[in-house]
Amino acid sequence: MSIHQSPIKRRESKKIWVGNVAVGGDAPISVQSMTNTRTTDVEATVAQIKSLERVGADIVRVSVPTMDAAEAFKVIKQQVNVPLVADIHFDYRIALKVAEYGVDCLRINPGNIGNEERIRAVVDCAKDKNIPIRIGVNAGSLERDLQEKYGEPTPQALLESALRHVDILDRFNFENFKVSVKASDVFLAVESYRLLAKQIVQPLHLGITEAGGARAGSVKSAVGLGLLLSEGIGDTLRISLAADPVEEVKVGFDILKSLRIRSRGINFIACPTCSRQEIDVIATVNALEQRLEDILTPMDVSIIGCVVNGPGEALISDLGVTGSNKMSGFYLDGVRQKERFDNEKLIDQLEAKIRARVAEQHNRIQIEQI
């Protein structure tokens, strides 16, 4: 097997649609984020959603806590292209209202929106409009009786909570849903998802909730989601960070990219640097990451500071640079080229080569489609 292929065999699951994005089945694992603006501030919320679209978010969730927020949601929905999930708790009327306004998915827990009549109203509405539901179980808001039964959040408690909500939807013959069982503790979340994956065929929405700030939260999410994804568990994911939501999307794609599950944009392979480096690897990588954020074409680019590991990494890269005194070696598809890069102009030259390679690939695809 090529090192560029993922050996992971995904769990079989039912496919549902969130707007025009398939979730589950053979669909690519989608990356989500959530706005952190006041939903009633339409201008700020739309701006944030568009910034998430630009970095590749497949789906965006918006909290809708009030009827005023529901009215704002209507205006927001008209101004963005990405599918929107409405996050709703307690008031079933809000769910009915955003359904009128074209919501692409409802994030609710059927058991906390009222009596059976209210649940039926929401489920029937979702059926009529073909709107999927996400059951979102969270260790921080576990039902009181389950807290008393288990003493604390446990994998069995989260599983029981999830299946309780699943049973409610089953009673109404509603199958268009996905489920999450999130926790801030990696082991708790991972084991909860493992148990749930054995019990249902619906898609699973992965996340380590309240993971923390940008650095610690990214690490915690990478560990937890990496374990699950490597076992084939998971159909869509959201990285929860106390940071700019744009970072959540970037980290989500980086996790998928690291497991060769879904590649998007440039995968930079760069050495941590030492006294042997002949080029400023750190400055080069940082500059190119910023300059090439608009590139969506998957591509491996190695930037190694010296000839110890540089040639070997270049062999398995689309483009590679090996640092050398004044003029650095350049590799294309693992083959060393006669052309060399002036170290003083390395960033500009490598950016030009990458963009030329992207254009070449796009042209080839267009010709093949004729």
Swiss-Prot record:
[4Fe-4S] cluster binds at residues 271, 274, 306, 313. Belongs to the IspG family. Its cofactor is [4Fe-4S] cluster. One of its GO terms (biological process) is isopentenyl diphosphate biosynthetic process, methylerythritol 4-phosphate pathway. It catalyses: (2E)-4-hydroxy-3-methylbut-2-enyl diphosphate + oxidized [flavodoxin] + H2O + 2 H(+) = 2-C-methyl-D-erythritol 2,4-cyclic diphosphate + reduced [flavodoxin]. InterPro entries: Dihydropteroate_synth-like_sf (IPR011005), Enolase-like_C_sf (IPR036849), IspG_bac (IPR016425), IspG_bac-typ (IPR004588), NO2/SO3_Rdtase_4Fe4S_sf (IPR045854). Its EC number is 1.17.7.3. GO terms for molecular function: 4 iron, 4 sulfur cluster binding; 4-hydroxy-3-methylbut-2-en-1-yl diphosphate synthase activity (ferredoxin); 4-hydroxy-3-methylbut-2-enyl-diphosphate synthase activity (flavodoxin); iron ion binding. Gene3D superfamilies: Dihydropteroate synthase-like (3.20.20.20), Sulfite Reductase Hemoprotein, domain 1 (3.30.413.10). Binds 1 [4Fe-4S] cluster. Keywords: 4Fe-4S, Iron, Iron-sulfur, Isoprene biosynthesis, Metal-binding, Oxidoreductase. Converts 2C-methyl-D-erythritol 2,4-cyclodiphosphate (ME-2,4cPP) into 1-hydroxy-2-methyl-2-(E)-butenyl 4-diphosphate. Pathway: Isoprenoid biosynthesis; isopentenyl diphosphate biosynthesis via DXP pathway; isopentenyl diphosphate from 1-deoxy-D-xylulose 5-phosphate: step 5/6. Signal peptide: none annotated. Pfam families: GcpE. SUPFAM superfamilies: Enolase C-terminal domain-like (SSF51604), Nitrite and sulphite reductase 4Fe-4S domain-like (SSF56014). This is 4-hydroxy-3-methylbut-2-en-1-yl diphosphate synthase (flavodoxin).
